[in-house]
């Protein structure tokens, strides 16, 4: 946000430089990002002086140039070649001397001594547009006879010099979106730092405001009282629309605003002065002499000031007359109701619109204006009348006219100040040191907080309604410390704290480690919108549409619910990549999923039926590796995905030997597997079925895993610490078995039986072949298994090995009905 140094000084009795003010403001939390010099005339007419033409003849080598001698008060007159048709001997003129820099928009050039058609020229006799004094270029500017030769041009044509102060305003500081608001902090800081009370915020008086007649009364009706809790307006008749005076133009230009006309400029001036947005209508265009504040039907067409026809939402608050809309409330005016050169009567609007309503409307239309910027953050609802009167008086002063209606002030809300009690012990605790009570109280007073009660233990204040973010004791502490200065809070020499040296799982570190591992294996992380379309849950049998968390005012039907699964976004990302001919894909995504359970609803607890679960999802499709001469890529499959899932579990120090496996019953999978630990489900992985793939126009196989990250962290927390062992001194022995088993027996069952039979010297069991071909009975399959045996204390003998293998074989045969091939 930009403010003007000269403008700030209108309201405060101080002689600080712009740099000093910038330092003070930054100390209060209004961080000054830049200071930029402003000149109402670029270059400030430096090097331009009053001269007198004492000699003028036609140029011998030109049919339009003239050779002149100009007295500029120097020892010798200047020889200047001039092309103006109106130059003549005896004229007083403005001369740009050698070295003067003249500006034309964003371009500039420097006057140099040179020759024009063979004649020496030592300066330039200027037209008014060349000096930015006026707009005429019909000829040179001829001055009155009483102008003194040699005087600087700036003596007769004063240049406004100012400094533009750019403040990086945070979203919570709506009270500082104006010159008065910024000065409020400056006054408080100066009075505290100089231990005085001499600085005061002097706000222009509106006591002269009075209604002169009611000849142009306009009725105001507010239908949507929630979106418009307060609407004020007044009519001024008999105005003359025209250019603004220089002082008003300079104030607006210094902060980057373009002058339009006196009426519009006054609205902008009061906005930047008070922080209260205004809108000025041509009163004669308000049909039916009635202003109605309401929402219109979905799809209603409306042309805004920029000439763009827009379709309205039925939630967009509009300012209408008796027949049609005139303005998008708090955002942008309409093309038909604005002030023009022919306007003679104006209706001034000063309202308080609901911040949420304005924010939604602004985003809906993609419009960000000075008004919406302030309304979105929360304006002062009690500033409407002051701003209205201030604007009306300025219009009378600069455009004439009479105040020709009573003020309409429709109020549908409670705008009494928030009352907050601050205990001094709490202030000192939060500050980290003792702050004198008198200092704290005076700071609050200087910030316009009204002290209601003061005791030795606490102070109770009414917070000004401009401070929409101050409503708790902690907020008052922040207000005090901003002015007190955080740099005045002493840093203690020591900190008394109890340190817990027991290592705890770091969720972010674990997440980062898993992300790095997946990225190292060729995965790309994706981040999808938490909002998705309800149609997915309706078309996929796996999800209950009654559990959707629905958005009350969705931007579109594609973003009307919160996702129940990361699956939707992941498959959409794969679809987008397939459309760009990228088919070999490995994606992972961390994110929340959201559920509504009506059965969990508890009276008085608004969030009770809602649940969030943090998940990690994996997606793989296409080839498993890049195609190179040295290797042949294969299509990814279920076991490829399983490898990555087990790798994540290993990374989280979860003992995969203790995992419980079961067949999944998820309807969007062709087949699936579920991993659990002590009854707690950790992960489901499987192959996406064709019905689901068709929803996303996918024609290639996709494998997907969803992992409950919250449960994984619990399992990690319960996992035993990593145990280090010395390298084995004695050799390991491998023995293989080929077993015929029922088809419904899986490897995990075989493995568990083997370890149950022998858990001392059996170190691992691996499946290296599956065969279901000839000579294998129907309903059976052959597993080729390898068993690794090792004793950490001695070398295994053949006798021990054979005895152990016999025990393992016998257990498998008895418990799983297996036979040796």
Predicted regions mapped to residue ranges:
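Conserved mixed alpha/beta core segments that line enzyme active sites in large multi-domain catalysts
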Residues: 49-80, 150, 249, 254, ...
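A carboxyl-terminal module marker
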Residues: 2, 19, 445-449, 460, ...
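Phosphate-backbone binding interfaces of nucleic-acid-interacting proteins
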Residues: 1-210, 347, 370, 378-381, ...
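Extended, well-folded interaction surfaces typified by the phenylalanyl-tRNA synthetase beta subunit core
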Residues: 181, 420-585, 735, 788-793, ...
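Terminal amphipathic helices with adjacent charged low-complexity linkers/tails
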Residues: 190-222, 399-427, 433-434
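Class II aminoacyl-tRNA synthetase-like tRNA-binding/catalytic domains
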Residues: 114, 292-332, 336-339, 495-612, ...
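Mobile "lid/hinge" segments at catalytic clefts and subdomain interfaces of large enzymes
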Residues: 117-130, 136-142, 154-163, 167, ...
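Glycine/proline-enriched, intrinsically flexible loops and inter-domain linkers
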Residues: 5, 23, 39-40, 201-300
């Amino acid at each position: 946000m930009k403010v003007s140094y000269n403008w700030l000084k209108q309201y405060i009795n101080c002689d600080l430089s712009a740099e000093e003010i910038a330092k003070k403001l930054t100390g209060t939390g209004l961080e000054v990002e830049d200071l930029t010099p402003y000149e109402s005339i670029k270059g400030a007419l430096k090097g331009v002086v009053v001269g007198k033409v004492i000699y003028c003849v036609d140029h011998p080598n030109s049919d339009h140039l003239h050779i002149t001698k100009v007295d500029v008060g120097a020892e010798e007159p200047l020889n200047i070649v001039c092309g103006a048709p109106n130059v003549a001997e005896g004229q007083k003129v403005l001369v740009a001397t050698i070295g003067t820099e003249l500006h034309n928009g964003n371009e500039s050039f420097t006057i140099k001594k040179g020759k024009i058609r063979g004649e020496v020229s030592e300066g330039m006799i200027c037209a008014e547009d060349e000096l930015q004094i006026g707009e005429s270029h019909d000829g040179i500017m001829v001055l009155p006879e009483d102008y003194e030769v040699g005087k600087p041009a700036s003596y007769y044509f004063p240049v406004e010099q100012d400094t533009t102060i750019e403040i990086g305003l945070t979203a919570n500081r709506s009270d500082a979106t104006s010159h008065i608001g910024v000065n409020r902090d400056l006054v408080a800081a100066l009075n505290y730092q100089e231990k005085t009370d001499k600085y005061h915020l002097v706000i222009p008086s509106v006591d002269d405001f009075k209604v002169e007649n009611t000849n142009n009364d306009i009725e105001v009706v507010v239908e949507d009282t929630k979106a418009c809790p307060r609407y004020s307006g007044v009519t001024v008749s008999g105005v003359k629309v025209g250019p603004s005076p220089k002082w008003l133009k300079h104030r607006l230009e210094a902060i980057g605003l373009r002058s339009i006309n006196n009426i519009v400029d006054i609205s902008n001036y009061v906005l930047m002065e008070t922080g209260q947005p205004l809108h000025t209508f041509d009163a004669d265009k308000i049909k039916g002499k009635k202003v109605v504040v309401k929402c219109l039907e979905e799809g209603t067409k409306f042309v805004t000031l920029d000439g763009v026809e827009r379709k309205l939402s039925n939630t967009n608050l509009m300012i209408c007359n008796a027949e049609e809309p005139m303005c998008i409330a708090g955002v942008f005016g309409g093309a038909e109701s604005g002030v023009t050169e022919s306007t003679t009567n104006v209706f001034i609007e000063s309202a308080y619109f609901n911040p949420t309503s304005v924010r939604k409307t602004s985003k809906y239309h993609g419009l960000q204006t000075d008004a919406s910027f302030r309304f979105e953050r929360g304006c002062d609802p009690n500033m409407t009348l002051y701003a209205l009167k201030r604007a009306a008086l300025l219009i009378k002063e600069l455009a004439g006219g009479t105040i020709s209606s009573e003020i309409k002030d429709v109020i549908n809300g409670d705008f009494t100040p928030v009352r907050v009690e601050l205990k001094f012990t709490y202030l000192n605790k939060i500050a980290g040191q003792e702050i004198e009570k008198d200092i704290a109280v005076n700071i609050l007073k200087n910030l316009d907080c009204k002290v209601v009660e003061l005791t030795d233990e606490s102070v109770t204040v009414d917070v000004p309604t401009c401070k929409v973010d101050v409503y708790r004791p902690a907020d008052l502490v922040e207000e005090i410390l901003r002015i007190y200065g955080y740099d005045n809070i002493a840093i203690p020499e020591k900190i008394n704290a109890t340190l817990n040296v027991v290592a705890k799982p770091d969720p972010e570190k674990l997440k980062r480690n898993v992300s790095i591992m997946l990225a190292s294996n060729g995965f790309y992380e994706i981040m999808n919108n938490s909002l998705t379309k309800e149609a997915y849950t309706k078309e996929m049998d796996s999800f209950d549409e009654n559990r959707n968390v629905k958005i009350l005012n969705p931007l579109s039907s594609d973003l009307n619910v919160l996702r129940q699964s990361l699956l939707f976004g992941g498959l959409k990302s794969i679809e987008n990549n397939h459309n760009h001919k990228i088919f070999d894909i490995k994606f992972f995504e961390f994110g929340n999923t959201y559920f509504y359970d009506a059965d969990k609803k508890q009276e008085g607890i608004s969030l009770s039926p809602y649940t969030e679960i943090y998940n990690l999802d994996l997606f793989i499709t296409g080839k498993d590796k890049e195609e190179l001469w040295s290797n042949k890529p294969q299509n990814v499959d279920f076991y490829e995905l399983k490898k990555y899932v087990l790798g994540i579990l290993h990374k989280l120090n979860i003992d995969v030997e203790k995992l419980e496996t079961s067949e999944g019953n998820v309807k969007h999978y062709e087949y699936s597997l579920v991993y659990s630990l002590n009854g707690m489900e950790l992960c489901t992985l499987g192959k996406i079925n064709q019905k689901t793939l068709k929803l996303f126009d996918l024609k290639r196989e996709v494998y997907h895993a969803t992992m409950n990250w919250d449960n994984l962290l619990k399992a990690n927390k319960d996992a035993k610490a990593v145990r280090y062992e010395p390298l084995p001194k004695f050799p390991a022995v491998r023995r293989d078995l080929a077993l015929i088993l029922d088809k419904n027996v899986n490897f995990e069952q075989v493995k568990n039986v083997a370890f149950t039979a022998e858990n001392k010297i059996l170190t691992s069991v691996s499946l290296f072949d599956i065969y279901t071909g000839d000579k294998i009975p129907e309903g059976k399959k052959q597993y080729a298994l390898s068993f690794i045996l090792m004793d950490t204390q001695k070398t295994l003998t053949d006798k021990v090995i054979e005895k152990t293998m016999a025990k393992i074989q016998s257990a498998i045969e008895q418990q799983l009905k297996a036979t040796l091939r």
